Protein backbone atom coordinates (compact mmCIF):
# COMPACT_ATOMS: atom_id res chain seq x y z
CA UNK A 1 0.00 0.00 0.00
CA UNK A 2 1.37 3.35 -0.98
CA UNK A 3 2.66 5.43 1.88
CA UNK A 4 1.63 9.08 1.75
CA UNK A 5 3.49 11.90 3.41
CA UNK A 6 1.50 14.35 5.45
CA UNK A 7 1.76 17.86 4.14
CA UNK A 8 1.24 20.76 6.51
CA UNK A 9 -1.57 22.06 4.37
CA UNK A 10 -3.51 18.92 3.59
CA UNK A 11 -3.30 15.27 2.64
CA UNK A 12 -2.50 14.64 -0.98
CA UNK A 13 -3.86 11.70 -2.92
CA UNK A 14 -2.14 8.76 -4.54
CA UNK A 15 -2.77 10.12 -7.99
CA UNK A 16 -1.59 13.16 -9.90
CA UNK A 17 -3.32 15.30 -12.48
CA UNK A 18 -1.58 15.10 -15.81
CA UNK A 19 -2.87 17.47 -18.47
CA UNK A 20 -2.96 21.25 -18.71
CA UNK A 21 -5.30 23.01 -16.32
CA UNK A 22 -5.40 26.79 -16.28
CA UNK A 23 -4.26 28.05 -12.88
CA UNK A 24 -3.07 30.95 -10.86
CA UNK A 25 -0.46 32.27 -8.44
CA UNK A 26 -0.26 30.36 -5.16
CA UNK A 27 0.27 33.25 -2.76
CA UNK A 28 -2.75 35.40 -2.09
CA UNK A 29 -4.76 37.18 0.51
CA UNK A 30 -7.93 35.48 1.73
CA UNK A 31 -10.33 38.11 0.44
CA UNK A 32 -8.87 40.00 -2.52
CA UNK A 33 -10.44 43.30 -3.43
CA UNK A 34 -12.62 43.52 -6.51
CA UNK A 35 -10.99 45.02 -9.61
CA UNK A 36 -11.27 48.74 -10.14
CA UNK A 37 -9.54 48.91 -13.51
CA UNK A 38 -8.77 46.20 -16.04
CA UNK A 39 -5.49 46.64 -17.88
CA UNK A 40 -5.46 43.94 -20.55
CA UNK A 41 -1.90 44.39 -21.83
CA UNK A 42 0.08 41.66 -20.09
CA UNK A 43 3.44 43.35 -20.77
CA UNK A 44 2.42 46.16 -18.42
CA UNK A 45 3.05 43.92 -15.42
CA UNK A 46 6.41 42.48 -16.45
CA UNK A 47 8.44 44.96 -14.34
CA UNK A 48 6.47 44.14 -11.18
CA UNK A 49 6.38 40.38 -11.74
CA UNK A 50 9.32 39.54 -14.03
CA UNK A 51 9.62 35.83 -13.23
CA UNK A 52 5.92 35.20 -13.51
CA UNK A 53 5.73 37.17 -16.75
CA UNK A 54 8.65 35.39 -18.42
CA UNK A 55 7.33 31.97 -17.43
CA UNK A 56 3.85 32.93 -18.72
CA UNK A 57 5.44 34.06 -21.99
CA UNK A 58 7.13 30.66 -22.24
CA UNK A 59 3.73 29.08 -22.92
CA UNK A 60 4.57 30.03 -26.52
CA UNK A 61 6.87 27.00 -26.47
CA UNK A 62 3.76 24.79 -26.21
CA UNK A 63 3.15 25.34 -29.91
CA UNK A 64 2.37 21.93 -31.41
CA UNK A 65 -1.02 21.62 -33.09
CA UNK A 66 -2.48 18.14 -32.61
CA UNK A 67 -5.48 17.34 -34.81
CA UNK A 68 -7.93 15.39 -32.63
CA UNK A 69 -10.24 14.65 -35.58
CA UNK A 70 -7.37 13.07 -37.52
CA UNK A 71 -6.51 10.95 -34.48
CA UNK A 72 -10.14 9.84 -34.05
CA UNK A 73 -12.41 10.35 -37.11
CA UNK A 74 -15.43 9.01 -35.20
CA UNK A 75 -15.70 12.47 -33.66
CA UNK A 76 -16.71 13.91 -37.02
CA UNK A 77 -19.82 11.71 -37.04
CA UNK A 78 -20.73 12.42 -33.43
CA UNK A 79 -20.52 16.17 -34.10
CA UNK A 80 -22.15 16.10 -37.55
CA UNK A 81 -23.83 19.44 -38.19
CA UNK A 82 -21.72 21.24 -35.57
CA UNK A 83 -18.56 23.32 -36.17
CA UNK A 84 -16.46 20.82 -34.19
CA UNK A 85 -16.87 18.37 -37.09
CA UNK A 86 -14.79 20.76 -39.20
CA UNK A 87 -11.90 21.36 -36.86
CA UNK A 88 -10.88 20.27 -33.37
CA UNK A 89 -7.30 20.58 -32.14
CA UNK A 90 -5.98 19.70 -28.72
CA UNK A 91 -5.11 22.70 -26.53
CA UNK A 92 -1.87 24.64 -26.89
CA UNK A 93 -0.23 27.16 -24.56
CA UNK A 94 -2.06 30.27 -23.37
CA UNK A 95 0.13 32.35 -25.69
CA UNK A 96 -1.96 31.02 -28.59
CA UNK A 97 -5.41 31.65 -27.13
CA UNK A 98 -6.36 34.49 -29.47
CA UNK A 99 -4.58 33.10 -32.53
CA UNK A 100 -6.22 29.71 -32.23
CA UNK A 101 -9.78 31.00 -31.90
CA UNK A 102 -9.21 33.32 -34.85
CA UNK A 103 -7.80 30.59 -37.08
CA UNK A 104 -9.98 27.61 -36.21
CA UNK A 105 -12.48 26.60 -38.88
CA UNK A 106 -15.15 26.58 -36.16
CA UNK A 107 -15.38 30.37 -36.08
CA UNK A 108 -16.04 30.53 -39.79
CA UNK A 109 -15.01 33.31 -42.18
CA UNK A 110 -17.10 36.38 -41.32
CA UNK A 111 -16.86 39.35 -43.66
CA UNK A 112 -18.02 41.99 -41.18
CA UNK A 113 -18.98 42.50 -37.54
CA UNK A 114 -22.52 41.17 -38.04
CA UNK A 115 -21.49 38.08 -40.02
CA UNK A 116 -20.48 34.54 -39.05
CA UNK A 117 -21.84 31.46 -37.26
CA UNK A 118 -20.84 32.10 -33.64
CA UNK A 119 -21.66 34.64 -30.89
CA UNK A 120 -19.41 37.07 -29.01
CA UNK A 121 -19.39 34.61 -26.10
CA UNK A 122 -16.82 32.48 -27.95
CA UNK A 123 -14.14 34.99 -26.91
CA UNK A 124 -14.95 34.68 -23.22
CA UNK A 125 -12.03 32.51 -22.12
CA UNK A 126 -9.39 33.86 -24.47
CA UNK A 127 -8.23 37.22 -23.20
CA UNK A 128 -8.18 39.81 -20.39
CA UNK A 129 -9.78 42.12 -22.95
CA UNK A 130 -13.00 40.26 -22.13
CA UNK A 131 -12.85 41.50 -18.54
CA UNK A 132 -12.01 44.97 -19.86
CA UNK A 133 -15.04 45.02 -22.15
CA UNK A 134 -17.38 43.66 -19.48
CA UNK A 135 -16.21 46.40 -17.14
CA UNK A 136 -16.60 49.01 -19.87
CA UNK A 137 -19.90 47.93 -21.45
CA UNK A 138 -21.49 45.62 -18.87
CA UNK A 139 -22.26 41.96 -19.53
CA UNK A 140 -25.15 42.67 -21.88
CA UNK A 141 -23.02 45.11 -23.82
CA UNK A 142 -20.19 42.62 -24.09
CA UNK A 143 -22.24 39.58 -25.08
CA UNK A 144 -24.51 41.05 -27.73
CA UNK A 145 -23.79 40.35 -31.37
CA UNK A 146 -21.59 38.04 -33.38
CA UNK A 147 -18.08 36.77 -32.65
CA UNK A 148 -16.59 38.93 -35.40
CA UNK A 149 -17.64 42.09 -33.54
CA UNK A 150 -14.94 41.38 -30.96
CA UNK A 151 -12.15 40.89 -33.48
CA UNK A 152 -10.61 44.38 -33.19
CA UNK A 153 -11.10 44.41 -29.39
CA UNK A 154 -10.05 40.95 -28.12
CA UNK A 155 -6.34 41.09 -28.82
CA UNK A 156 -4.24 40.22 -25.75
CA UNK A 157 -3.75 36.56 -24.94
CA UNK A 158 -5.11 35.02 -21.75
CA UNK A 159 -3.01 36.53 -19.00
CA UNK A 160 -2.59 38.62 -15.88
CA UNK A 161 -5.95 40.40 -15.49
CA UNK A 162 -7.90 37.21 -16.13
CA UNK A 163 -6.85 35.87 -12.73
CA UNK A 164 -5.44 38.80 -10.74
CA UNK A 165 -6.77 42.11 -9.47
CA UNK A 166 -4.05 44.01 -11.27
CA UNK A 167 -5.34 47.39 -10.07
CA UNK A 168 -4.77 46.48 -6.44
CA UNK A 169 -1.92 48.16 -4.53
CA UNK A 170 -1.09 44.73 -3.15
CA UNK A 171 -0.60 43.35 -6.66
CA UNK A 172 1.79 46.21 -7.37
CA UNK A 173 3.79 45.10 -4.33
CA UNK A 174 4.11 41.58 -5.70
CA UNK A 175 1.10 39.89 -4.11
CA UNK A 176 -1.14 37.65 -6.25
CA UNK A 177 -4.50 39.27 -5.39
CA UNK A 178 -6.62 36.62 -7.10
CA UNK A 179 -10.03 37.57 -8.42
CA UNK A 180 -12.88 36.24 -10.52
CA UNK A 181 -12.76 38.58 -13.50
CA UNK A 182 -15.87 37.01 -15.09
CA UNK A 183 -19.09 37.95 -13.25
CA UNK A 184 -20.91 34.89 -14.60
CA UNK A 185 -18.28 32.67 -12.96
CA UNK A 186 -18.79 34.42 -9.63
CA UNK A 187 -22.54 33.80 -9.86
CA UNK A 188 -21.95 30.14 -10.67
CA UNK A 189 -19.70 29.68 -7.64
CA UNK A 190 -22.36 31.26 -5.46
CA UNK A 191 -24.95 28.86 -6.93
CA UNK A 192 -22.95 25.90 -5.57
CA UNK A 193 -22.41 27.57 -2.20
CA UNK A 194 -18.90 28.88 -2.82
CA UNK A 195 -18.93 32.68 -2.85
CA UNK A 196 -15.42 33.70 -3.84
CA UNK A 197 -14.93 36.35 -1.15
CA UNK A 198 -15.69 33.81 1.60
CA UNK A 199 -13.58 30.98 0.18
CA UNK A 200 -10.25 29.94 1.64
CA UNK A 201 -7.13 30.65 -0.34
CA UNK A 202 -6.76 27.08 -1.66
CA UNK A 203 -10.37 27.09 -2.84
CA UNK A 204 -9.83 30.45 -4.49
CA UNK A 205 -6.83 29.14 -6.40
CA UNK A 206 -8.93 26.50 -8.12
CA UNK A 207 -11.97 28.76 -8.48
CA UNK A 208 -9.92 31.18 -10.57
CA UNK A 209 -9.03 28.31 -12.91
CA UNK A 210 -12.69 27.34 -12.84
CA UNK A 211 -13.68 30.55 -14.61
CA UNK A 212 -12.72 28.89 -17.88
CA UNK A 213 -11.99 25.22 -17.27
CA UNK A 214 -15.66 24.36 -16.87
CA UNK A 215 -18.78 23.26 -18.71
CA UNK A 216 -20.87 26.21 -19.88
CA UNK A 217 -23.52 27.12 -22.41
CA UNK A 218 -24.82 30.22 -24.19
CA UNK A 219 -28.02 31.39 -22.55
CA UNK A 220 -30.88 33.50 -23.84
CA UNK A 221 -31.21 35.85 -26.76
CA UNK A 222 -27.85 37.47 -26.01
CA UNK A 223 -26.03 34.11 -25.87
CA UNK A 224 -24.46 34.97 -22.52
CA UNK A 225 -22.18 32.45 -20.82
CA UNK A 226 -23.81 30.46 -18.02
CA UNK A 227 -22.63 27.42 -16.07
CA UNK A 228 -25.34 24.70 -15.78
CA UNK A 229 -24.80 24.13 -12.07
CA UNK A 230 -28.23 25.09 -10.72
CA UNK A 231 -29.03 21.44 -9.91
CA UNK A 232 -25.47 20.35 -9.09
CA UNK A 233 -22.18 19.62 -10.83
CA UNK A 234 -22.39 15.91 -11.60
CA UNK A 235 -23.07 14.77 -15.15
CA UNK A 236 -26.62 13.69 -14.25
CA UNK A 237 -27.33 17.02 -12.53
CA UNK A 238 -26.29 19.04 -15.55
CA UNK A 239 -28.15 16.69 -17.89
CA UNK A 240 -31.29 17.18 -15.83
CA UNK A 241 -30.82 20.95 -15.92
CA UNK A 242 -30.41 21.03 -19.70
CA UNK A 243 -33.42 18.76 -20.22
CA UNK A 244 -35.53 20.91 -17.91
CA UNK A 245 -34.87 24.06 -19.94
CA UNK A 246 -35.05 22.14 -23.25
CA UNK A 247 -31.59 23.34 -24.26
CA UNK A 248 -29.51 21.93 -27.10
CA UNK A 249 -26.29 23.16 -28.67
CA UNK A 250 -27.21 21.83 -32.11
CA UNK A 251 -29.09 19.08 -33.93
CA UNK A 252 -27.03 16.19 -35.24
CA UNK A 253 -27.45 16.25 -39.01
CA UNK A 254 -27.67 12.45 -39.27
CA UNK A 255 -29.94 11.38 -36.40
CA UNK A 256 -31.71 14.76 -36.03
CA UNK A 257 -31.10 14.49 -32.29
CA UNK A 258 -30.98 17.71 -30.22
CA UNK A 259 -27.46 17.42 -28.84
CA UNK A 260 -25.34 18.78 -26.01
CA UNK A 261 -21.67 19.64 -26.50
CA UNK A 262 -19.50 19.49 -23.41
CA UNK A 263 -16.73 22.08 -23.26
CA UNK A 264 -13.74 21.50 -20.95
CA UNK A 265 -15.12 20.56 -17.52
CA UNK A 266 -11.88 20.26 -15.56
CA UNK A 267 -13.28 22.06 -12.51
CA UNK A 268 -16.23 19.70 -12.25
CA UNK A 269 -14.20 16.54 -12.79
CA UNK A 270 -11.34 17.67 -10.54
CA UNK A 271 -13.91 18.37 -7.81
CA UNK A 272 -15.19 14.79 -8.14
CA UNK A 273 -11.71 13.26 -7.84
CA UNK A 274 -9.52 12.49 -4.86
CA UNK A 275 -7.28 15.50 -5.43
CA UNK A 276 -10.22 17.87 -5.46
CA UNK A 277 -11.74 16.25 -2.40
CA UNK A 278 -8.46 16.85 -0.55
CA UNK A 279 -8.15 20.38 -1.96
CA UNK A 280 -4.99 19.70 -3.90
CA UNK A 281 -5.32 22.67 -6.22
CA UNK A 282 -4.56 23.17 -9.88
CA UNK A 283 -1.42 25.16 -9.11
CA UNK A 284 0.01 22.44 -6.86
CA UNK A 285 0.45 20.24 -9.91
CA UNK A 286 0.47 22.60 -12.89
CA UNK A 287 2.04 25.83 -11.54
CA UNK A 288 4.50 24.86 -8.80
CA UNK A 289 6.83 27.11 -6.87
CA UNK A 290 10.28 27.14 -8.51
CA UNK A 291 13.49 29.11 -7.96
CA UNK A 292 14.82 31.89 -10.15
CA UNK A 293 18.51 32.50 -10.82
CA UNK A 294 18.89 34.30 -7.49
CA UNK A 295 17.29 31.44 -5.58
CA UNK A 296 14.01 33.27 -4.97
CA UNK A 297 10.80 31.24 -5.11
CA UNK A 298 8.04 32.22 -7.51
CA UNK A 299 5.00 30.58 -9.07
CA UNK A 300 5.78 29.12 -12.49
CA UNK A 301 3.21 30.45 -14.98
CA UNK A 302 4.25 28.08 -17.76
CA UNK A 303 1.25 25.91 -17.07
CA UNK A 304 2.00 22.33 -17.98
CA UNK A 305 2.70 18.71 -17.21
CA UNK A 306 3.51 18.00 -13.54
CA UNK A 307 6.22 15.54 -14.61
CA UNK A 308 8.19 18.44 -16.07
CA UNK A 309 8.69 19.69 -12.49
CA UNK A 310 8.48 16.37 -10.67
CA UNK A 311 10.52 17.42 -7.62
CA UNK A 312 8.32 20.50 -7.09
CA UNK A 313 4.98 18.76 -7.73
CA UNK A 314 4.41 15.03 -7.27
CA UNK A 315 7.44 14.44 -5.05
CA UNK A 316 6.12 16.87 -2.45
CA UNK A 317 3.66 14.20 -1.36
CA UNK A 318 4.28 10.93 -3.19
CA UNK A 319 7.06 8.52 -2.25
CA UNK A 320 7.09 6.69 -5.58
CA UNK A 321 9.68 7.63 -8.15
CA UNK A 322 8.81 9.38 -11.39
CA UNK A 323 8.77 6.21 -13.50
CA UNK A 324 6.33 4.49 -11.15
CA UNK A 325 3.90 7.39 -11.23
CA UNK A 326 4.19 7.72 -14.99
CA UNK A 327 3.17 4.06 -15.22
CA UNK A 328 0.07 4.82 -13.13
CA UNK A 329 -0.79 7.70 -15.45
CA UNK A 330 -0.37 5.58 -18.57
CA UNK A 331 -2.51 2.74 -17.23
CA UNK A 332 -5.35 5.01 -16.20
CA UNK A 333 -5.22 6.89 -19.49
CA UNK A 334 -5.39 3.63 -21.42
CA UNK A 335 -8.40 2.41 -19.42
CA UNK A 336 -10.29 5.62 -20.12
CA UNK A 337 -9.35 5.63 -23.80
CA UNK A 338 -10.33 1.99 -24.36
CA UNK A 339 -13.84 2.56 -23.02
CA UNK A 340 -14.09 5.91 -24.82
CA UNK A 341 -13.54 4.23 -28.20
CA UNK A 342 -16.12 1.53 -27.45
CA UNK A 343 -18.75 4.15 -26.59
CA UNK A 344 -17.92 6.13 -29.73
CA UNK A 345 -18.41 3.05 -31.91
CA UNK A 346 -21.86 2.50 -30.43
CA UNK A 347 -22.81 6.15 -30.92
CA UNK A 348 -21.62 6.19 -34.53
CA UNK A 349 -23.89 3.22 -35.27
CA UNK A 350 -26.76 4.82 -33.36
CA UNK A 351 -26.59 8.03 -35.42
CA UNK A 352 -26.57 6.17 -38.74
CA UNK A 353 -29.30 3.76 -37.62
CA UNK A 354 -31.44 6.68 -36.51
CA UNK A 355 -30.95 8.25 -39.94
CA UNK A 356 -32.08 4.98 -41.55
CA UNK A 357 -35.20 4.95 -39.37
CA UNK A 358 -36.02 8.54 -40.32
CA UNK A 359 -35.44 7.80 -43.99
CA UNK A 360 -37.85 4.86 -43.64
CA UNK A 361 -40.58 7.14 -42.33
CA UNK A 362 -40.20 7.00 -38.55
CA UNK A 363 -42.32 9.64 -36.84
CA UNK A 364 -41.26 12.25 -34.32
CA UNK A 365 -43.09 10.34 -31.58
CA UNK A 366 -41.37 7.09 -32.52
CA UNK A 367 -37.94 8.74 -32.52
CA UNK A 368 -38.28 10.76 -29.30
CA UNK A 369 -37.23 8.06 -26.78
CA UNK A 370 -34.41 6.95 -29.08
CA UNK A 371 -33.12 10.48 -29.53
CA UNK A 372 -33.30 11.04 -25.78
CA UNK A 373 -31.03 8.03 -25.27
CA UNK A 374 -28.60 9.22 -27.95
CA UNK A 375 -28.54 12.72 -26.44
CA UNK A 376 -27.87 11.44 -22.94
CA UNK A 377 -25.31 8.85 -24.04
CA UNK A 378 -23.28 11.34 -26.04
CA UNK A 379 -23.51 14.00 -23.33
CA UNK A 380 -22.05 11.62 -20.75
CA UNK A 381 -19.34 10.45 -23.15
CA UNK A 382 -18.49 14.05 -24.04
CA UNK A 383 -18.31 15.31 -20.48
CA UNK A 384 -15.91 12.47 -19.70
CA UNK A 385 -13.57 12.98 -22.65
CA UNK A 386 -13.74 16.78 -23.07
CA UNK A 387 -11.79 17.06 -19.83
CA UNK A 388 -8.46 15.98 -21.27
CA UNK A 389 -6.93 15.10 -17.90
CA UNK A 390 -9.82 13.13 -16.43
CA UNK A 391 -7.76 9.95 -16.30
CA UNK A 392 -5.88 11.55 -13.40
CA UNK A 393 -8.27 14.26 -12.18
CA UNK A 394 -11.09 11.76 -11.59
CA UNK A 395 -10.48 8.39 -13.28
CA UNK A 396 -13.20 6.56 -11.39
CA UNK A 397 -15.75 9.22 -12.29
CA UNK A 398 -14.59 9.15 -15.90
CA UNK A 399 -15.09 5.40 -16.14
CA UNK A 400 -18.46 5.70 -14.42
CA UNK A 401 -19.68 8.34 -16.87
CA UNK A 402 -18.45 6.34 -19.85
CA UNK A 403 -20.13 3.22 -18.46
CA UNK A 404 -23.50 4.97 -18.24
CA UNK A 405 -22.93 6.39 -21.72
CA UNK A 406 -22.43 2.85 -23.02
CA UNK A 407 -25.68 1.75 -21.37
CA UNK A 408 -27.64 4.64 -22.88
CA UNK A 409 -26.17 4.03 -26.34
CA UNK A 410 -27.09 0.34 -26.09
CA UNK A 411 -30.64 1.30 -25.10
CA UNK A 412 -30.89 3.54 -28.16
CA UNK A 413 -29.66 0.83 -30.50
CA UNK A 414 -32.02 -1.78 -29.03
CA UNK A 415 -34.99 0.54 -29.58
CA UNK A 416 -33.73 1.34 -33.07
CA UNK A 417 -33.52 -2.34 -34.02
CA UNK A 418 -37.15 -2.81 -32.99
CA UNK A 419 -38.29 0.33 -34.79
CA UNK A 420 -36.39 -0.53 -37.97
CA UNK A 421 -37.98 -3.98 -37.97
CA UNK A 422 -41.43 -2.38 -38.01
CA UNK A 423 -40.34 -0.54 -41.16
CA UNK A 424 -39.26 -3.79 -42.79
CA UNK A 425 -35.55 -3.23 -42.21
CA UNK A 426 -33.93 -6.21 -40.54
CA UNK A 427 -30.46 -6.09 -42.09
CA UNK A 428 -27.49 -4.36 -40.52
CA UNK A 429 -27.24 -0.66 -41.35
CA UNK A 430 -24.03 -0.10 -43.26
CA UNK A 431 -21.63 2.57 -42.02
CA UNK A 432 -19.69 4.46 -44.72
CA UNK A 433 -15.91 4.48 -44.69
CA UNK A 434 -14.92 6.89 -41.91
CA UNK A 435 -11.39 5.60 -41.45
CA UNK A 436 -9.90 9.07 -41.90
CA UNK A 437 -10.99 12.57 -40.96
CA UNK A 438 -11.39 13.46 -44.62
CA UNK A 439 -13.58 10.45 -45.38
CA UNK A 440 -15.74 11.07 -42.31
CA UNK A 441 -16.22 14.73 -43.28
CA UNK A 442 -17.19 13.65 -46.77
CA UNK A 443 -19.69 11.18 -45.29
CA UNK A 444 -21.57 14.00 -43.54
CA UNK A 445 -21.51 16.24 -46.59
CA UNK A 446 -18.88 18.81 -45.64
CA UNK A 447 -17.20 20.68 -48.49
CA UNK A 448 -13.89 21.07 -46.71
CA UNK A 449 -12.09 22.53 -49.72
CA UNK A 450 -14.51 25.45 -49.78
CA UNK A 451 -14.53 25.84 -45.98
CA UNK A 452 -10.72 25.98 -45.86
CA UNK A 453 -10.50 28.40 -48.79
CA UNK A 454 -12.97 30.77 -47.14
CA UNK A 455 -11.01 30.62 -43.89
CA UNK A 456 -7.72 31.38 -45.60
CA UNK A 457 -9.29 34.39 -47.27
CA UNK A 458 -10.55 35.56 -43.85
CA UNK A 459 -7.07 35.17 -42.35
CA UNK A 460 -5.48 37.12 -45.21
CA UNK A 461 -8.03 39.93 -45.45
CA UNK A 462 -10.09 40.39 -42.27
CA UNK A 463 -7.54 39.71 -39.52
CA UNK A 464 -5.11 42.36 -40.88
CA UNK A 465 -7.97 44.87 -40.71
CA UNK A 466 -8.56 43.91 -37.07
CA UNK A 467 -4.86 44.27 -36.28
CA UNK A 468 -4.72 47.71 -37.87
CA UNK A 469 -7.62 48.84 -35.67
CA UNK A 470 -5.97 47.31 -32.59
CA UNK A 471 -2.77 49.27 -33.15
CA UNK A 472 -4.68 52.45 -33.93
CA UNK A 473 -6.67 52.14 -30.69
CA UNK A 474 -3.60 51.36 -28.57
CA UNK A 475 -4.84 47.97 -27.42
CA UNK A 476 -1.49 46.24 -27.92
CA UNK A 477 1.84 47.04 -26.29
CA UNK A 478 3.66 46.64 -29.59
UniProtKB/Swiss-Prot annotation:
UniProt-listed InterPro entries: Cyt_c552, Cyt_c_NO2Rdtase_formate-dep, Multihaem_cyt_sf
Residues at which heme c 5 binds: 275, 314, 317-318
Annotated heme c 4 binding sites: 282, 285-286, 393
Cofactor detail note: Binds 1 Ca(2+) ion per monomer.
Predominant location category: periplasm
Family according to the record: Belongs to the cytochrome c-552 family.
NCBIfam families: cyto_c552_HCOOH (TIGR03152), PRK11125.1 (NF008339)
Name of protein: Cytochrome c-552
Biological source species: Escherichia coli O17:K52:H18 (strain UMN026 / ExPEC)
